[in-house]
């Protein structure tokens, strides 16, 4: 917000045009654009359509205008809506640096801002302005400037009582005004004229910033500026409670398809909304979009890089083709209904070549694909009950909706996610600690870490989930990561080891759960080639692909340099090629060997109690 007072206050001269000592140009002609607004709207943003308008936030200093405007801008951009925020403090450092706070200066301040906002809106952006703009006539003039250009203008009164604004008083301006050090301070000795008929009133003393943003978004949706699907909620596929009895009765009478554990894990992924906006297993159109473009394209560009499919044998197809619905059975229990099924050919070699970049049958997930049925089945999924595995870890299996609520309860203003399938060593911790530090430096006050181990199928030589969770708990107990600002939860997806293709899936799933930032390190979702032993994917490509991937617009990728053990400093550190001799790369193979043999890793590699958990697992494995 702009400084709302001045040590030198001029007499109010009214709201007429000011000469400002400048000669008015008369030899100018308005030049019409060759590009129409509709045509411009087709290429601005990721969703198409002209959305130009101005959202004019007005209110007292400390009411929350800047906070709401910045959060609104972030929300819109994250959902593919182009926008720009004009803030009072920022404008007064450049365009309006020659203006003070007298009534006539305020009038000119608002006029210039309105003209600039009109240009942004005409360019197809949602322009958000954050200014005290205390006078009704000045705000009305701003509206007329937009209406004269046939551009929507939404006045939003950010309403907080004066005593609340004084309590907030981050800059200490109210205190100075009360002491007489600032004259003409709005709300103290200069009048603020409340809007008489704003499009929206935000009560910031009663609503948090997310609620305020949602109210503005709903206004923009009502006025057809923002499409409704631009802010879709998590799409869960559980049958509503009031329809559950009927659905279960229906499921008992339907023909059925047996599914395995990995299928069931994908059912959970879909049911909990991780693959939003999918309404079930992919139909052929969705499958082809995913396979060829790594995205869903109907309703906007939505990143979804891995096929989420259900397979069937030739016998299953002959039995079920033509049915309008059938039940899915897992371990003797009917867990879901697939309605309006669509059968299409499972071209396994083509799928593997595109998803993994190899058809090597020794790759563990490719091996599973090659052994699956020759048909894929898409359809609308209705899951009957919440899925529990009864392994002592269900309390960590938080859905995207539950995670969002958890972050809200923690008053998080930034959520950064870290996906892992291995035990946490201090190199991982370095990435997470550094991200937390960077976010604080960028002005976030309560960044929260989502430590999100993968909980679905993994290959045989990976550490089982139960032991990984014990190890993660030890890392938190030792204070390597801050338990007060960390949420540990389990991501239910199977692990596909698909490198840059797979890491896009990992990233977008955390996006659905409310993450704003995603940490990516070396060789994410990669593995050695099962036959040559060399890296199947170039270790740097995962991070590079994420920074370019379409449809990952609601979060920011945080790529990091490689972390390795610094022998001189005796701790994990970022690798420096100029001091290569100081560094040691401790591979997973070596780590497992040390643990199996009861040896300790180098000092500073991993928290001691966390290493003890790992050693205990490998000892138990030796005895098995």
From Swiss-Prot:
UniProt keyword Acetylation present: yes
Annotated pathway: Sulfur metabolism; sulfate assimilation
Chain positions found as N6-acetyllysine: 12
Region (Adenylyl-sulfate kinase): 1-225
Entry binding sites for ATP 1: 62-67, 207, 212
Entries under InterPro entries matching the protein: APS_kinase (IPR002891), ATP-Sase_PUA-like_dom (IPR025980), P-loop_NTPase (IPR027417), PUA-like_sf (IPR015947), Rossmann-like_a/b/a_fold (IPR014729), Sulfurylase_cat_dom (IPR024951), Sulphate_adenylyltransferase (IPR002650)
Top-level division of the source organism's lineage: Eukaryota
Annotated ATP 2 binding sites: 419-422, 521-525, 563
Residue sites binding adenosine 5'-phosphosulfate per the record: 89-92, 101, 106-109, 132-133, 171, 184-185
Keyword terms of this UniProt record: Acetylation, ATP-binding, Kinase, Multifunctional enzyme, Nucleotide-binding, Nucleotidyltransferase, Transferase
Residues recorded as bearing N-acetylmethionine in the entry: 1
Keyword Acetylation: yes
GO molecular function, one term: nucleotidyltransferase activity
Pfam family, one: ATP-sulfurylase
GO biological process, one term: 3'-phosphoadenosine 5'-phosphosulfate biosynthetic process
Enzyme Commission (EC) number: 2.7.7.4, 2.7.1.25
Region (Sulfate adenylyltransferase): 234-624
Enzyme class: transferase
Known catalytic reactions: sulfate + ATP + H(+) = adenosine 5'-phosphosulfate + diphosphate; adenosine 5'-phosphosulfate + ATP = 3'-phosphoadenylyl sulfate + ADP + H(+)
Family: In the N-terminal section; belongs to the APS kinase family.
Quaternary structure annotation from Swiss-Prot or TrEMBL: Homodimer.
PANTHER family linked to this entry: BIFUNCTIONAL 3'-PHOSPHOADENOSINE 5'-PHOSPHOSULFATE SYNTHASE, BIFUNCTIONAL 3'-PHOSPHOADENOSINE 5'-PHOSPHOSULFATE SYNTHASE 1
Protein name from the UniProt record: Bifunctional 3'-phosphoadenosine 5'-phosphosulfate synthase 1
Lineage summary: Eukaryota, Metazoa, Chordata, Craniata, Vertebrata
